[in-house]
């Protein structure tokens, strides 16, 4: 019996190893500008943060779509993954804060009219929120949110909290994104698409599932009477 040679790749495609071939690292790592093409050295930092964020958002969208059609247990697992993806996207913004305002200004000249509003990942995720809420309401079967939170029946209560956590993570990203922009270019200027940066600040208060936030007010008021 001939021993298998594990030093040689067995998958098709370019790359010296199966790791490179499966992950298509040649293509992936060619998506960033070379050192010779960069107008400023921090273009690599900026591009890496945003490209990796789009990958995490792609996964988040995949998991949310799964949650819409899954039974409760699987939906909770998928929503938990989506939440972790959003945490990673939010944490990645810290790297942008390591750029000085001067360096960011240099990179900004290369962005054209590109802005965070154009993120296909966030746009897709936003479009999936109504479907999530519709599915959750179907699971409630006429049970009010107030009764749900008074008695905490599982798995409905866990699903409600998972939706709230997803909504909360989107808000946390908006806050961090706004503060990152304010720190790098200021809050009283015009963005790359001609929109005042202060508009980002107003988006902080938007909610995907406002009913889940409002029921907390109802519970608190009811407890005080």
Protein language model features and the residues they cover:
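Surface-exposed peri-terminal alpha-helical interaction modules
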Residues: 1-225
């Amino acid at each position: 019996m001939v021993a298998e040679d594990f030093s040689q790749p067995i998958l098709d495609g370019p790359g010296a190893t199966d790791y490179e071939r499966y992950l298509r690292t040649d293509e992936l790592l060619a998506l960033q500008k070379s050192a010779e093409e960069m107008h400023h050295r921090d273009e690599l930092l900026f591009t890496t943060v945003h490209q990796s964020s789009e990958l995490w958002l792609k996964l988040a969208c995949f998991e949310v779509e799964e949650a819409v059609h899954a039974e409760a247990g699987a939906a909770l697992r998928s929503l938990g993954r989506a939440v972790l993806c959003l945490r990673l996207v939010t944490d990645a913004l810290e790297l942008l804060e390591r750029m000085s305002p001067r360096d960011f200004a240099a990179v900004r000249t290369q962005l054209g009219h590109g802005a965070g509003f154009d993120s296909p990942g966030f746009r897709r995720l936003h479009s999936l929120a109504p479907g999530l809420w519709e599915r959750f309401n179907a699971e409630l079967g006429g049970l009010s949110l107030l009764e749900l939170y008074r008695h905490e029946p599982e798995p409905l209560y866990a699903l409600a909290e998972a939706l709230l956590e997803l909504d909360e993570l989107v808000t946390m990203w908006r806050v961090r994104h706004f503060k990152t922009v304010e720190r790098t270019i200021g809050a009283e200027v015009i963005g790359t698409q001609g929109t005042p940066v202060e508009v980002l600040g107003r988006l902080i208060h938007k909610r995907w599932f406002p009913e889940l936030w409002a029921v907390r007010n109802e519970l608190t008021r009811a407890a005080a009477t």
